[in-house]
């Protein structure tokens, strides 16, 4: 998967706050670039593209992964946009981030890739692993000294519970739309992909 390795604050200035990408907030109230071009009237396509980019950058996923999540959400029963957000939020890297074990989703992805996280007692090194209701997420005993709890400034969501002493968390239920920590209109993302 190709990752975004350039300046993250530039993306935040363009798209707005993205808690999964970086903790930093922008102090400049203008668009990135040398000459700070004022945005003209956005077309419908530009608005939909911007919402799609928010999802892509916040969760650190590629275009193909996002498209595959859209296709999977379309095949399921329910609102496609809400199902898409649920699948993205129930990824293991996103759960580790929301538990406060990492300050950003890229950091939580690295923790998972390096084998520091266990799910239901089994070592899992796949960041896209889909967590389910009742799953127990814990840090390996040998890895507890590298984890800084509370490095994430976001409050713990209601669908998760965390034991900070033992660095264990549990998924109480599948996340609802109102608990997603990202300001996004998921219907515009679905409309963007409906043309493909």
Identify the function of each model-found stretch.
Residues 102-105:
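Beta-rich strand-turn-strand
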């Amino acid at each position: 998967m190709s990752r975004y390795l350039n300046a993250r604050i530039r993306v935040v200035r363009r798209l707005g706050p993205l808690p999964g990408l970086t903790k930093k907030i922008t102090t400049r109230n203008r668009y990135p670039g040398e000459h700070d071009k004022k945005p003209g009237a956005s077309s419908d396509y530009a608005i939909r593209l911007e919402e799609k980019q928010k999802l892509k950058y916040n969760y650190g996923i590629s275009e193909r992964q996002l498209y595959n999540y859209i296709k999977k959400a379309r095949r399921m029963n329910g609102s496609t946009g809400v199902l898409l957000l649920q699948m993205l939020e129930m990824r293991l890297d996103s759960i580790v981030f929301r538990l406060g074990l990492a300050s950003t989703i890229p950091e939580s992805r690295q923790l998972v890739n390096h084998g520091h996280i266990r799910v239901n007692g089994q070592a899992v090194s796949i960041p896209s692993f889909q967590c389910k209701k009742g799953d127990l997420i814990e840090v390996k005993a040998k890895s507890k000294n590298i984890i800084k709890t509370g490095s994430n400034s976001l409050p713990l969501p209601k669908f998760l519970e965390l034991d900070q002493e033992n660095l264990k968390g549990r998924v109480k239920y599948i996340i609802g739309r109102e608990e997603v920590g990202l300001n996004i209109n998921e219907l515009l993302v679905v409309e963007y992909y409906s043309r493909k």
